[in-house]
Amino acid sequence: MAGIKEECGVFGIYDLDGGNVVPSIYYGLTSLQHRGQESCGLAVSDTKGERGNVKFHKDLGLVSEVLRQDVVRKYEGDIGIGHVRYSTTGASVAENAQPLVLSYVKGTLALAHNGNLVNTPELKWELIQNGAIFHTTTDSEVIAFHIARERVHTRTVEDAVLKTAHKLKGAYALVVMSPRKLIGIRDPLGLKPLCLGKRDNT
């Protein structure tokens, strides 16, 4: 092996005191930059504000290039996720940058994903047969679509994430955000790193 292939990094944060998490996402992604240098982005929600108002910014480039200070000043929220990408599935194009943000019948869903699935073709074909149209070439979008689909038939987004997780085969770590909730999940064997931390009420 020529070297370690880090293959993406994910970050999620929720400030229970209502503070702005955007600076923390920026510094978190900067700390994770070694895990992916192709693209990056963030998605945030203000749980005190308009319901379903998820704002996001993503593009090709390093954290310092994509999330410049003049850009991040436009974003504010007390809940958010971020992503740095090293592509293993899907092309290195702006459309494949994350987080992915979907609007669907139950509202808005944002997802950042690290990992590889071995059953992506089967999961994608199931969605295509039911009319899904894909805008990226990533397995991350397949996961997001399945969560949204399950959410239509479940009581909570947590239930939808768990039902989707049972379908996934492979190594993965995900952070999933609805306008008022943040969920982190990894594969049962813990092959992809996902750490939980606490700072004050964040």
Question: Residue ranges of each PLM-predicted region?
Answer:
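Conserved short alpha-helical segments that host acidic/polar catalytic motifs at enzyme active sites
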Residues: M1-T202
